[in-house]
């Protein structure tokens, strides 16, 4: 199926008016994703509203503040990027950002790296094939990012252990969630205390076309993350903090 363009109301709902070059890049990204998805099982959200709402809108709706200061150079990392979201959408929307896309599955990172190159983003988008627990202990990455994001990766305490060690002390982690209840905050806040971090905001948004409610958790460090985190590969998911 050919790439499509959303109606103007889509951008109004998102609260962001991309340049024509950015619109062209997002449309090109849809075509690239469709093509690569025939070879590598990246995602089912590639056509029509599945792509524009389920991928682009869902990636960018939490970034209202960041989109208003899009020319500010920042270092971002997308953990568990899968088919490249939200990382590739963020790289297009924030033209001064340096974005690292991380996934442990080599077939996915190869596809995402090729898409970034085709989009002309290779100078700002780096791709890394590695388990996040390893990256979080690498001195070249630990404590290096202004923003760390993850969408649909694991339970919130697990994701926090993945993201917080990557942050600068004035950085912020963005945890994309589907549903979120007050009861979820109890184990999550216990985990954050161990990581020397705090929950600063819970945002929520109804997606267009009745595509469900999404939540975003914004987390900030209280100081450097204790060096014991992240724990060994597999331990965060097997034995979540705060449980």
UniProtKB/Swiss-Prot annotation:
GO molecular function: rRNA (guanine-N7-)-methyltransferase activity
EC number(s) given by UniProt: 2.1.1.-
One GO cellular component term noted in the UniProt record for this chain: cytosol
Family to which the UniProt record says this protein belongs: Belongs to the methyltransferase superfamily. RNA methyltransferase RsmG family.
Species of origin: Synechococcus sp. (strain CC9605)
InterPro entries: rRNA_ssu_MeTfrase_G, SAM-dependent_MTases_sf
Protein name: Ribosomal RNA small subunit methyltransferase G
Keyword terms of this UniProt record: Cytoplasm, Methyltransferase, rRNA processing, S-adenosyl-L-methionine, Transferase
Annotated localization: Cytoplasm
Keyword Ubl conjugation applies: no
Cited NCBIfam families: rsmG_gidB
HAMAP family: 16SrRNA_methyltr_G
The keyword Transcription regulation appears for this protein: no
Residues reported to bind S-adenosyl-L-methionine: 80, 85, 132-133, 151
Purpose: Specifically methylates the N7 position of a guanine in 16S rRNA.
Region (Disordered): 211-243
């Amino acid at each position: 199926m050919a790439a499509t363009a959303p109606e103007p109301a889509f951008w109004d709902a998102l609260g962001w008016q991309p340049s024509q070059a950015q619109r062209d890049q997002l449309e090109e990204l849809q075509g690239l994703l469709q093509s690569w998805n025939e070879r590598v099982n990246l995602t089912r959200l590639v056509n029509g509203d599945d792509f524009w709402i389920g991928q682009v809108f869902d990636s960018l709706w939490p970034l209202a503040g960041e989109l208003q200061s899009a020319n500010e150079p920042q270092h971002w990392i997308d953990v568990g990027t899968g088919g490249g979201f939200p990382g590739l959408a963020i790289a297009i929307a924030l033209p001064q950002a340096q974005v690292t896309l991380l996934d442990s599955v080599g077939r996915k990172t190869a596809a995402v790296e090729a898409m970034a190159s085709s989009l002309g983003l290779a100078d700002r988008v780096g791709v890394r094939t590695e388990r996040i627990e390893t990256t979080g202990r690498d001195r070249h990455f630990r404590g290096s990012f202004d923003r760390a994001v993850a969408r649909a990766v694991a339970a919130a305490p697990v994701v926090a252990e993945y993201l917080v060690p990557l942050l600068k002390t004035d950085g912020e982690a963005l945890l994309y969630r589907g549903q979120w209840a007050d009861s979820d905050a109890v184990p999550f806040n216990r985990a954050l205390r161990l990581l020397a971090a705090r929950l600063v905001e819970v945002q929520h948004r109804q997606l267009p076309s009745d595509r469900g409610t999404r939540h975003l958790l914004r987390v900030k460090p209280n100081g450097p993350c204790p060096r014991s985190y992240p724990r060994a590969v597999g331990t965060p998911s097997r034995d979540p903090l705060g449980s």
